Design a protein with these regions (language model features):
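Intrinsic disorder/low-complexity signature
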Residues: 5-6, 15, 20, 113, ...
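Intrinsically disordered, low-complexity regulatory segments enriched in Ser/Thr/Pro
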Residues: 73-134, 145
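Charged, low-complexity intrinsically disordered regions
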Residues: 40, 47, 135-143
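Negatively charged, low-complexity tracts enriched in Asp/Glu with abundant Ser/Thr
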Residues: 3-80
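N-terminal cationic amphipathic segment used for targeting or macromolecule association
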Residues: 12, 49, 133, 147-148
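Generic secondary-structure transition motif, activating predominantly at the C-termini of alpha-helices
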Residues: 21, 54-55, 140-147
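Alpha-helical protein-protein interaction elements
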Residues: 17, 31, 38, 62-66, ...
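Short intrinsically disordered terminal tails
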Residues: 1-8, 141-150
Length: 150
């Protein structure tokens, strides 16, 4: 996917995360619907292309719709040669605006990983796709320098 397409996907995700994805106006939920389903689909497309652009191997991209009270989440876990990256996109229930979480992982089943880093909805809306790639690649460089120091 092109940088322009991924930048558009970032903007689309930011717009979707700006609305209440868990509110369906008192109707019973029988699976994800409407904006929530669009969020889950766009999120997975975005993360698959992100993994490819970062050169990740052993990639798993998934989504979890959750229940009626949450937005659901899209996640990516992928490996480089000496470690990997976990990325999760969701709408925070507390309204903090932190919509994209990322951290290093040691292996593809590492759900603790390194320190959490966050990108806000506003940053997702304003940053270029290359800025996001640079932020994630910086984490990889930090990981590799920590490994060499140890």
């Amino acid at each position: 996917m092109s940088i322009k397409s991924q930048t558009n996907n970032m903007r689309r995700l930011a717009a979707l995360l700006n609305i209440n994805l868990c509110n369906i106006h008192g109707k019973k939920e029988c699976g994800p619907n409407g904006s929530k389903q669009v969020f889950l689909n766009v999120g997975k497309v975005f993360l698959r292309a992100l993994a490819r652009d970062l050169g990740l191997r052993e990639v798993t991209v998934s989504s979890n719709a959750g229940g009626i009270g949450v937005s659901g989440e899209c996640s990516l876990i992928g490996m480089w040669e000496n470690g990997g990256l976990y990325v999760s996109i969701s709408q925070p229930a507390c309204g903090s605006g932190k919509v994209l979480l990322y951290r290093t992982v040691r292996h593809s089943r590492d759900y603790k990983g390194g320190y959490n880093h966050f990108i806000t909805r506003h940053e997702l809306e304003k940053w270029s796709y290359t800025h996001l790639l640079d932020a994630l690649c910086a984490l990889r460089k930090d990981w590799e320098s920590d490994e060499q120091a140890a």
